[in-house]
């Protein structure tokens, strides 16, 4: 009995010490970055803003998101974080990155709250939600976005990422570009969001160091796992952007590339063969201009997902290709799957718990029709 009491006391002590340490780390960070633009709110103010947390927008492993309203009348989204070491680091990453920047294609961080175990981040509210619900519709009667709007979204996302890479005093690498992290305002203008995995580097640093691979399965650049491909750099975001474009065009979620299904194949290879033969995708009653825009999206995506980082364009070059003349675009080499026999670099523990050998989840297309 005494042993159980001692063990319980030790667990409580460790729990309290860990959370005190987290609080201290966050407070130290905030004290050292007083010049950041976001406003610090008290927890009582957060409760008023959300009207007692009545309108819940969503929930995830990080915590919950609520709709709120500032005294100015501005509608906001309030992300309440569950206290943990991971979420504490995510909180610091968010405030450190988007707390210092402003761009039309990057979500704006309005404020935050740190009050004991109560952590919150306050953003501009995006009424049209995230991009994934438009390219992976779950409702049968869902009206898809036009190809023209999808093309404009692709351009906006590219501009947002380009700004992160080149438009700030520091180089910001996002490391988690995917449809779920692209929010859409009332005019469907895209905003890059969720900077929990982002890292800040010197603007002139071409290769960066990481202690662990980071990102979401299917969008992670191969160099984060395989050492003989090349160093980790802003080209990792370029790769993720390419996979995002592929999903926007293919309108298919990621599945296991090793699934034994003869009706499915690796989508980039399939679409590469079509484009290389001069064939268009089946796009219904799309106009010729829309077909050209989608063709550009595909070719740019194929360049962005090249295996070696050195073969991928910068975001500036990718945007130049997206905005340029389709006739001037050259086809890149055919994309390949990650090779299973490449040596794996030890980047530490994978935060997603995904072994490197399983990072071959690829987008597929059904040959029986969508």
What are these regions (language model features)?
Residues 1, 21-23, 76, 261-262, ...:
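Intrinsically disordered, low-complexity cytosolic regulatory tails
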Residues 1-34, 132-140, 200-202, 217, ...:
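Terminal membrane/secretory targeting segments in land-plant proteins
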Residues 66-83, 97, 108:
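Glycine-rich ATP phosphate-binding loop
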Residues 91-96:
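Regulatory alphaC helix of protein kinase catalytic domains
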Residues 110-117, 127:
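Short beta-strand micro-motifs within the conserved protein kinase catalytic domain, predominantly
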Residues 116-124, 132-133:
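A conserved loop-to-beta-strand element in the N-lobe of protein kinase catalytic cores
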């Amino acid at each position: 009995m005494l042993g159980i009491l001692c063990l319980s006391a030790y667990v409580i002590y460790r729990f309290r010490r860990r959370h005190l340490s987290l609080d201290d780390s966050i407070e130290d960070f905030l004290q050292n970055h007083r010049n950041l633009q976001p406003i610090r709110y008290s927890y009582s103010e957060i409760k008023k803003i959300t009207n007692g947390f009545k309108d819940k927008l969503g929930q995830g492993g990080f915590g919950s998101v609520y709709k709120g309203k500032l005294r100015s009348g501005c509608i906001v989204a309030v992300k309440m974080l569950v206290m943990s070491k991971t979420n504490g680091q995510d909180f610091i990453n968010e405030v450190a990155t988007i707390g210092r920047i402003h761009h039309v294609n990057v979500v704006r961080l309005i404020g935050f709250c740190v009050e004991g175990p109560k952590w919150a981040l306050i953003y501009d509210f995006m009424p049209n939600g995230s991009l994934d619900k438009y390219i992976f519709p779950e409702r049968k009667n869902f009206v898809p976005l036009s190809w023209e709007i999808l093309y404009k979204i692709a351009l906006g996302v590219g501009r947002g990422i380009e700004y992160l890479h080149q438009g700030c005093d520091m180089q910001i690498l996002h490391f988690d570009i995917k449809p779920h992290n692209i929010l859409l305002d009332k005019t469907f203008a895209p905003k890059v969001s969720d900077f929990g995995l982002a890292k800040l580097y010197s603007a002139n640093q071409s290769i960066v160091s990481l202690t662990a691979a980071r990102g979401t399965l299917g969008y992670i650049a191969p160099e984060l796992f395989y050492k003989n491909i090349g160093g980790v750099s802003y080209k990792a975001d370029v790769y993720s952007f390419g996979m995002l474009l592929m999903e926007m065009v293919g309108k298919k979620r990621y599945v296991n590339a090793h699934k034994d299904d003869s009706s499915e194949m690796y989508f980039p290879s399939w679409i590469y063969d079509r484009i290389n033969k001069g064939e268009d995708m089946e796009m219904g009653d799309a106009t010729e201009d829309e077909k050209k825009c989608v063709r550009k999206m595909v070719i740019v995506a194929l360049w962005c997902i090249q295996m070696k980082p050195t073969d991928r364009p910068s975001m500036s070059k990718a945007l130049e290709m997206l905005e340029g003349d389709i006739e001037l675009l050259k086809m890149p080499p055919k994309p390949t799957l990650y090779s299973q026999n490449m040596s794996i670099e030890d980047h530490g523990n994978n935060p997603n718990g995904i072994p490197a050998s399983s990072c071959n989840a690829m987008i597929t297309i059904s040959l029986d029709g969508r």
